[in-house]
Amino acid sequence: MQRNFILTDVMKTGAHQTYERFLDAHSLPDQKMDYTGEYYTLHNYDLDAYDRKFAFIDRTIVNDRVCANPEYQKELLIRVRLLHSQGFKFIMASPWESHENIKSGNIYPNDIKGITSFNWTGGVSWFWWYMYDKHLNNTFKFTHDHFGSYFYKKHDFLYLNKIPREHRVKLYNKLLKEGVLSNSLYTFLELDKPVRLTQEHELPWVKPEDYPIWGLDQDITEQPYIDTVCSIVSETNDNDTDVFMTEKIWKPIMAQHVFVVHGNHLYLQKLREIGFKTFGSYFDESYDLENDKDKKIDAIVSLCKHLKTVNWQDIYRQTIALRQHNYDTFFNKEKLSAEVNKTLIGFLEFFDSSQVSS
């Protein structure tokens, strides 16, 4: 059994307890993890007894409220230098973001001169775990046939956008131009003229005009899924370098909703690789194989135009087992743990390779 010590937030400005719960979801049989989120308690531990020592530098975007403070920056460097001298390796903790977001964003610190670090980004495991952790004990009443009484959907698509990104704006404008959204529920909250849900379909505890830029994206309510046939999932990125899965895909999976995804190249393939099923037996999912971003948008728009004409009652009947499988897989602790393990293995391999190279 190898022992690992993790200081889960060097400056205690982020959400160290959230990180610790994520780490606790691992199932690596030969690894023990001990944590503290408090730098000033390190003297209570026999640090020489550990095989590995990590320190997380939290780079949550809300930390910009303190990161510009020169005193914060000075103290961070002091702590990092001291921890480094004691054999700690550093994890730049940005699991809420993708690699692309980190490269293009203004996140502090980008790196620390002379210190090798590991960039922890969201990938597949973070938001799966976060949504699992948040909603495991919640009771939802999603239904797509009014609990066996009859099949009726008021609207076609559920299509939720918040922050404008180039690929999102392109798809949104083309869907509008082609009339695809004529009978759909859709939003684009951060446009100059925001497009919002009505109160009927918004989170019941939030006024549509008061929906905040941060804090509620991982919440979910039943009505918009009950009233629509298919989610158009507008993911954060559309690159071909990595797959970043956010709450945007886990919500329709929790709701047992049919989905089309505008996201990274081979996004659906990655979903299948980690145990989920997609809808390629019921409609064309070849858009996932298209690496040209504009052609992918064209393929998604063409598919959505077609989906407005299909018999959705038949599709929902035929996909009962598939959608239940996805729901069960999402809430399967062992399958989730396997993905968390991959994240932790990345940490462990980083430490071990750093030891060799140094």
Language model features by range: what are they?
Residues 1-233, 239-246, 250-358:
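Pol beta-like nucleotidyltransferase catalytic core
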